[in-house]
Amino acid sequence: MAKTAKSKQSVDVADLTKAQAKVEWKRLALELETHDRLYYQEDAPKISDAAYDELRRRFNAIEKRFPELVSRDSPSQTVGAAPSGRFKKVRHAVPMLSLDNAFAEEDVRDFVGRIARFLKLAEDDRIAFSAEPKIDGLSMSLRYEGGQLVTAATRGDGAEGEDVTANIRTLKDVPQKLHGRNLPDICEIRGEVYMTKQAFLALNERQKEAGDTIFANPRNSAAGSLRQKDPTITASRPLGFFAYAWGDMSAMPAETQSGMIKWFEHCGFTTNPLTKLCHSVEELIAFHRAIEEQRAELDYDIDGVVYKVDRIDWQERLGFVSRTPRWGIAHKFPAERAMTVLKDIEIQVGRTGSFTPVGKLEPVGVGGVIVQNVTLHNEDYIKGIGNKGEVLREGRDIRIGDTVVIQRAGDVIPQVVDVLIDKRPADAEVFAFPRKCPCPLHTDVVREETAAGEEGSRARCTGEFACPYQKIEHLKLFASRRAFDIDGLGEKQIQFFFDEGWVKEPADIFTLQKRNAKLKLEEVEGYGETSVRNLFNAIEARREMALERFIYALGMRYVGETTALALARGYGSWEAFHDACLKVANGDEEAIAEMDALDQIGETVIKSVAAYFGEDHNRGIVERLTREVKILDAEKPKRNSPIATKTVVFTGTLEKMTRDEAKATAERLGAKVSGSVSKKTDYVVAGPGAGSKLKDAEKHGVKVLTEDEWLQLIGE
């Protein structure tokens, strides 16, 4: 899976009230169903495996404490996701269930203990386990009748999958006819379709050159390659298959899991060579550690190891519980670390001129994702110094050419957690942090001050909007959803227009159509008459803009959406705001005092406004833009609404409007929206997933509303 999902709750399950548990159970159920669909149907996971496991762990813990919440369609009772509808459906004769997870050695000991108790074994009875790496690929069931492959189906929701027979026939690891004699009439062989890391990198290079989809990780590329309507596309992709299980069998050719693995090999299948027979908990844990040590060296992704009771008659006695077998478990790996070489360090310049050093890595798989870039934060971080002056990595600095250890803790953004000094080459290069901006202007770089007036760790270019790097980032902000929100003008299009010299400042966006007779945009690759017409219509639709959005779109430092709204409400019109800004820039004490008196406006914002409007270049940008755009007066908050002057906090997931919409509506009706609950809070609007803020509301005696009650209160 891909990126992480931050947990929306902080209350321990043991501390949840029944009402809180019910709300969170519903939210987690919906979230898990969504991620199952993205993973199993669309091959486009939005969170990492570790983050998904954490969600499911919490969900299961809630159901364990409140068993009355469990329902037939609960994610704890189902597997995967329903077939997508792109392929013919196939009913599994024997359901394809998933394994329960173990995250700690204690979980493995509990697993073995449960089996011994269930089978009523004596203390000296030994249980043999077949242990194997857990391949991170796409589960597949292959049905053979009379030794011939007749159907290949994906897992789907465990009961029903998708027919991908034509595509599976293109895999060299899948025999069309089983080898050997005296084969059972019906054999269902199950295993994992995967793509090697090397093949994945090569495929992405070809995809990039062809302008096609770039896959996030080998698992996604394997799934996407297999679920093609055209089998020739699948045939062109280097997919492998490991056999490790079975489904419907008219006769069993072996009495043990390990015996079945050998039989798969005799039939012509590839099995994982690291599979091993273990006879104790200690051997299982040693196997897990050994595989984890080899993980980075393997040419395919794994996310844990699997333990299965070896004796098939014991597997049958143990049976299943809900969606998982009692006889098997997946022992997952912790947040993955990987070693790689830092090839270079590049500087990225942000919209406000902030410098961010980015490490360029030899591509390496971490947590199911190929990582090539890593943020190095700032100059001090590279030197081994933290934001508060603390020592990082025992003071080891980061040099170009170093072997570094990177980690996706919780599988979030990769970070450098260590530098291997013993692997440092003699020619490792100390990174010289630039004192001039890398832009053509080569303007000076300064270190920002902290709130205490001390030198901070963040470096910034002083070129402002004359700096082309800042220009392009400002243009991206200007067209973004929270500013002018111009449909069809995303970051990619802005970059293209900027590189071509067609859009250098915001006003240029509104003159594109006028200049198109010369530009001939419809002749540019990727555009046509219809798309160009749609773009121009979208631009025209933004010729009128709310004052707060306009102020935000100017991109002044420290002026985010909330501050922009406060300024818009404080001055009411563009004319009044513009006049005040010019006076503030000229040091007019009365104007400065008036701005300082506004709600949520302080010295930092005033300095930023003064600096912005004190520059001739910026005033020119604003003047040219206001010739193209009509700026609407700020909407005055309704003072007669039931929430006028009230303080509102939103928490949890809102289902009938986005958080931004709810915030905007509340502010339009005269309320103040806060991010935390205090004695001054009037209402907490709680949706599914509401966590600690509900407890805070109870502590302070604040009224809690559901989303429906909130909408009823405001009359919407």
Curated annotation (Swiss-Prot):
Superkingdom of origin: Bacteria
Cofactor entry: Mg(2+); Mn(2+)
Transmembrane residue ranges: none
SUPFAM superfamilies: BRCT domain (SSF52113), DNA ligase/mRNA capping enzyme, catalytic domain (SSF56091), Nucleic acid-binding proteins (SSF50249), RuvA domain 2-like (SSF47781)
InterPro entries: BRCT_dom, BRCT_dom_sf, DisA/LigA_HHH, DNA_ligase, DNA_ligase_AS, DNAligase_adenylation, DNAligase_N, NA-bd_OB-fold
GO CC terms in record: cytosol
HAMAP family xrefs: DNA_ligase_A
List of catalytic residues: 134
Organism the protein comes from: Bradyrhizobium sp. (strain ORS 278)
Reactions listed under catalytic activity: NAD(+) + (deoxyribonucleotide)n-3'-hydroxyl + 5'-phospho-(deoxyribonucleotide)m = (deoxyribonucleotide)n+m + AMP + beta-nicotinamide D-nucleotide
Protein name (Swiss-Prot/TrEMBL): DNA ligase
GO process terms (BP): DNA repair; DNA replication
Binding residues annotated for NAD(+), in chain numbering: 49-53, 98-99, 132, 155, 192, 308, 332
Claim: DNA repair is one of the keywords in the record: yes
Keywords attached to this entry: DNA damage, DNA repair, DNA replication, Ligase, Magnesium, Manganese, Metal-binding, NAD, Zinc
Binding annotation for Zn(2+): 437, 439, 461, 467
UniProt similarity note: Belongs to the NAD-dependent DNA ligase family. LigA subfamily.
GN (gene name): ligA
Function: DNA ligase that catalyzes the formation of phosphodiester linkages between 5'-phosphoryl and 3'-hydroxyl groups in double-stranded DNA using NAD as a coenzyme and as the energy source for the reaction. It is essential for DNA replication and repair of damaged DNA.
Enzyme Commission number(s): 6.5.1.2
Molecular function terms, GO-annotated: DNA ligase (NAD+) activity; metal ion binding
High-level lineage: Bacteria, Pseudomonadati, Pseudomonadota, Alphaproteobacteria, Hyphomicrobiales
